[in-house]
Swiss-Prot record:
EC number of the protein: 3.4.25.2
GO MF annotations in UniProt: metal ion binding; threonine-type endopeptidase activity
Localisation per UniProt entry: Cytoplasm
Activity regulation, free text: Allosterically activated by HslU binding.
Top-level EC class as recorded in UniProt: hydrolase
Binding site residues for Na(+): G161, C164, T167
Name assigned to this protein: ATP-dependent protease subunit HslV
Organism: Wolinella succinogenes (strain ATCC 29543 / DSM 1740 / CCUG 13145 / JCM 31913 / LMG 7466 / NCTC 11488 / FDC 602W)
Length: 176
C-alpha cells in the first residue's frame, strides 16, 4: 500500500468522476497540501489518477498517454498494451505507483506490478492509503443516498481524509 494519497473513481449513470486529495507526504512530514493527482487524457475523453511516488506516476502517465494516442483513445486496448509493456520492462516493474483510468464505459486499476483490474461492480474503484475508506464510503453512499456523482466522490474522499493520516480534505474532481 502506498502511504501517499487517495484516489476515487465512480462511474454513474450520467457522469464518470475521478477525485483525489491534495496531500504529498514524505515520511512523517506533509510537504504539500494542494497537489493535483488527477488528469484528463486524450482530448478530455479519459480520466486518470495516481497514488504513489510522484516521479514514478509521471513516468507512467507519459507512457500511458503515448499508448492511448497510438490506440486512438481505445481504453481497453490501451490498458492491455500498457500492462504488457509494464511487465516487460525491468525498470517499470520497480516503479512505486498505481493508476486508475476510466472513460464513460469502463474503469480500470493499473497496479504497480502491471496488473489490470476492472472492479467487480464496474463502477467504483479506489487506490492509495485512504482507498479502502473512500471505497467503503462510496459504496454506502451509492447504495443508500441519492447524490450526484461528483458529490458522492467528494463526500467519500472527505470521509477518507478524516480517517487516513496520509490523505487530506483538499479535494479535486474531474468529470466526464
Amino acid at each position: 500500500m502506498f502511504e501517499a494519497t487517495t484516489i476515487l473513481a465512480y462511474k454513474g449513470e450520467n457522469h464518470s468522476v475521478i477525485g483525489g486529495d491534495g496531500q504529498v507526504t514524505f515520511g512523517n512530514c506533509v510537504l504539500k497540501g494542494n497537489a493535483t493527482k488527477i488528469r484528463m487524457l486524450y482530448n478530455g475523453k479519459i480520466l486518470s489518477g495516481f497514488a504513489g511516488s510522484t516521479a514514478d506516476a509521471f513516468t507512467l502517465f507519459e507512457m500511458f498517454e503515448r499508448i492511448l494516442e497510438n490506440r486512438k483513445g481505445d481504453l481497453v486496448k490501451s490498458v492491455i498494451d500498457f500492462s504488457k509493456e509494464w511487465r516487460k520492462d525491468k525498470y517499470l516493474r520497480r516503479l512505486e505507483a498505481m493508476m486508475i483510468v476510466m472513460d464513460r464505459e469502463r474503469l480500470f486499476i493499473l497496479s504497480g506490478t502491471g496488473d489490470v483490474v476492472e472492479p467487480e461492480d464496474g463502477k467504483i474503484a479506489a487506490i492509495g492509503s485512504g482507498g479502502n475508506y473512500a471505497l467503503s464510503a462510496a459504496r454506502a453512499l451509492d447504495k443508500f443516498a441519492d447524490l450526484p456523482e461528483s458529490e458522492l466522490v467528494r463526500e467519500s474522499l472527505l470521509i477518507a481524509g478524516e480517517l487516513c493520516i496520509y490523505t487530506n480534505t483538499n479535494i479535486k474532481l474531474l468529470e466526464l
